[in-house]
């Protein structure tokens, strides 16, 4: 009997041991998963997102069903702007915790960041139907309004939420930011002061206070708030970057450059710090040092448009035409132009060729630019470019043959029939000054408005109807811009401003009448991705050009026919009817973009019958009994009234709200 009892006990012990061992292993794994989760949460609190991702991934390796770890991993990817991956993980978390409203709210924020606004709206409504006063959902609903470019609705929503939660830091800051974006700086200041009063030791509140005060041009106070933010959290990168910008805007260029060195030492990929250091050196008249710094920055990220724009402007203003660095940076544009041309992106290729030729006008690559003009349907301009190459002594047999062939081909062109030279007859009828107010800085780039204004002015050079006036882009205040534009005889002047985040840019161009300073029009563009500065600037130029009446001059009259100095390249179309106005009698309207003249000054009509590349002819019809049409009279086509471009969601505001923790 004892032998059977001993055998039975041994069998039970052997059978139970694997189960106990497995249970012990599982418990240890769960304990380790919990430890990794806690470590990840602490790293999130320190905003150490990369380490937090590592901890949560290890947590989920040990316990794949850890709902909070899954949700936290999704939040980390959201903070790292990896929104697709964040959505993947938050939906896994949702399956593990279907009733968790925090997970549902996180999904809303991710959907908004991905631009899936309808899906985000449906989820917001679903949550509010269950919990009408869910604080996080109310915050998300306001961000959704901003994404849909409804800042007024967002302000009302945040204001209502603040009444329910008057001490909520995020709501107060959000309300301050949205109010500021609507132009109410005083109210925005009141809200951020309330947040400061209720959260006196919170470094993030001081950071946003510094931003809001800086946008109200209260730079000294803003520096104080940024300093307090760094006092409470010395390694807070956004406050350090903002402090560098504030020192720059306050004229403390040496200190701004020093802070940029600190930022670059910590993160060599911080392109805004390279950019700001280059600007600071330029303001200190250390152009060669600035060129060195910006050249290094371009080697770190050659696609940064702001750095390249400032670098090229500095090279143009402080080096000779023979400087080899010009040819080097011009070649970058030529290579990019060839890439666009291979993909049949003609407008983009033309832009890059022009940028390159601006740096190195005698480059042999002008030949490729000429060929692109020919393919675009401008043989006369193609011939002009080839003759320029001949004049420079860089023509070969192929170019010489092409000049001869196209010279013969154009022998029957209108300008030959009327025995005129289109190059000598070309005339730009609009004078436009492009400015940016000196205090206009975006969240990512100081003086962003003046950089964008420079790109816009360069693009206007290639508009055959517009003379962009060569004046200082940075103007201290509106009155100074108005005075300079008026005294220089500008028809209109434009003030450019920029808002941006790490991926998107929005440019606003406000046009004013040069004579009166009255508003003339507002133009908006929004672009995202690579080349966004270039594309957004082109959008502004396209809108501005389309809003201006077409103007030309009657050059030669032969009985009922007349030749004008505008053609296909200027947008002249066959069968279009133009007003013929007495020379020197028209003037710009006191407000808006228009030309005004009396019926007595309207001496006739011109119907276009034949359009050449740079000139056109048409049939004349007099206005009234007497024929008063003379060479030198102006030919005008009032621009069609088009629906102005709508302002898009403020990318800078969206970024500030998205990163608000």
For each feature predicted by the language model, list its residue ranges.
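Canonical tetratricopeptide repeat
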Residues: 38, 72, 106, 140, ...
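Surface-exposed, polar/charged interaction patches used for macromolecular assembly or partner binding
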Residues: 193, 197, 224-227, 231, ...
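Helix-start (N-cap) detector for alpha-helical repeat units in TPR-like alpha-solenoids
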Residues: 33-34, 67-68, 101-102, 135-136, ...
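Short coil turns that delineate tetratricopeptide repeat
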Residues: 30, 64, 98, 132, ...
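Alpha-helical segment of the N-proximal tetratricopeptide repeat
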Residues: 31-62, 79, 113, 140-147, ...
């Amino acid at each position: 009997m004892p032998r059977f009892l001993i055998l039975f006990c041994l069998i039970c012990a052997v059978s139970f041991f694997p189960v106990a061992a497995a249970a012990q292993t599982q418990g240890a794994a769960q304990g380790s998963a919990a430890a990794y989760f806690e470590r990840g949460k602490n790293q999130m609190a320190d905003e150490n997102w990369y380490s937090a991702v590592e901890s949560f991934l290890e947590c989920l390796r040990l316990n794949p069903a850890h709902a909070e770890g899954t949700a936290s991993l999704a939040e980390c990817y959201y903070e790292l702007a990896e929104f697709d991956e964040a959505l993947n993980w938050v939906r896994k978390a949702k399956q593990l915790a279907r009733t968790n409203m925090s997970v549902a709210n996180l999904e809303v924020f991710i959907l908004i960041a991905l631009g899936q606004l309808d899906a985000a709206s449906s989820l917001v409504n679903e949550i509010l139907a269950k919990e009408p006063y869910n604080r996080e959902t109310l915050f998300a609903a306001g961000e959704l309004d901003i994404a849909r470019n409804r800042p007024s609705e967002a302000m009302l929503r945040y204001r209502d939420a603040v009444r329910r939660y008057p001490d909520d830091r995020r709501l107060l800051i959000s309300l301050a930011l949205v109010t500021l974006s609507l132009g109410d700086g005083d109210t925005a200041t009141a809200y951020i002061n309330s947040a400061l009063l209720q959260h006196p030791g919170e470094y993030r509140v001081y950071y946003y206070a510094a931003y809001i005060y800086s946008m109200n041009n209260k730079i000294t106070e803003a520096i104080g708030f940024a300093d307090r933010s760094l006092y409470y959290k010395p390694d807070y990168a956004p406050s350090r970057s903002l402090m560098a910008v504030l020192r720059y805007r306050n004229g403390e260029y040496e200190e701004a450059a020093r802070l940029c060195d600190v930022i670059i030492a910590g993160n060599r990929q911080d392109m805004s710090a390279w950019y700001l250091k280059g600007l600071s050196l330029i303001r200190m008249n250390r152009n060669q040092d600035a060129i060195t710094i910006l050249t290094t920055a371009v080697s770190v990220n050659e696609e940064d448009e702001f750095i390249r724009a400032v670098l090229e402007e500095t090279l143009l203003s402080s080096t000779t035409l023979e400087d080899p660095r010009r040819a080097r940076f011009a070649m970058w544009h030529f290579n990019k132009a060839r890439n666009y041309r291979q993909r049949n992106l003609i407008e983009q290729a033309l832009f890059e060729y022009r940028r390159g030729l601006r740096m190195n006008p005698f480059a042999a690559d002008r030949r490729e630019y000429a060929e692109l003009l020919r393919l675009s349907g401008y043989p006369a301009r193609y011939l002009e470019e080839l003759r320029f190459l001949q004049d420079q002594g860089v023509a070969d047999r192929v170019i010489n043959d092409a000049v001869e062939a196209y010279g013969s081909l154009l022998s029957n062109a209108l300008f030959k029939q009327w025995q005129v030279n289109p190059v000598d007859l070309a005339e730009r009828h609009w004078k436009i000054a492009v400015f940016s107010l000196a205090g206009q800085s975006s969240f990512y780039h100081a003086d962003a408005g003046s950089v964008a204004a420079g790109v816009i002015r360069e693009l206007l050079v290639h508009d055959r109807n517009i003379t962009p006036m060569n004046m200082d882009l940075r103007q201290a205040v509106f009155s100074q811009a108005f005075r300079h534009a008026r005294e220089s005889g500008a028809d209109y002047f434009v003030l450019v401003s920029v808002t941006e985040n790490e991926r998107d840019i929005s440019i606003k161009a406000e046009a004013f009448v040069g004579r009166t300073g009255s508003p003339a029009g507002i133009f908006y563009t929004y672009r995202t991705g690579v080349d966004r500065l270039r594309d957004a600037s082109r959008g502004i130029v396209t809108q501005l050009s389309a809003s201006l009446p077409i103007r030309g001059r009657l050059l030669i009259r032969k009985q009922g026919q007349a030749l004008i100095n505008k053609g296909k390249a200027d947008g002249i179309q066959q069968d279009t009817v133009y007003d013929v106005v007495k020379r020197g009698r028209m003037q710009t309207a006191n407000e808006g973009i228009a030309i005004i003249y009396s019926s007595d000054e309207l001496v006739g009509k011109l119907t276009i019958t034949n359009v050449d590349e740079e000139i056109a002819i048409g049939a004349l019809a007099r206005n009234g009994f007497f024929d008063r049409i003379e060479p030198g009279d102006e030919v005008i086509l009032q621009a069609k009234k088009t629906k102005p471009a709508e302002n898009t969601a403020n990318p800078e505001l969206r970024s500030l709200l998205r990163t608000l923790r």
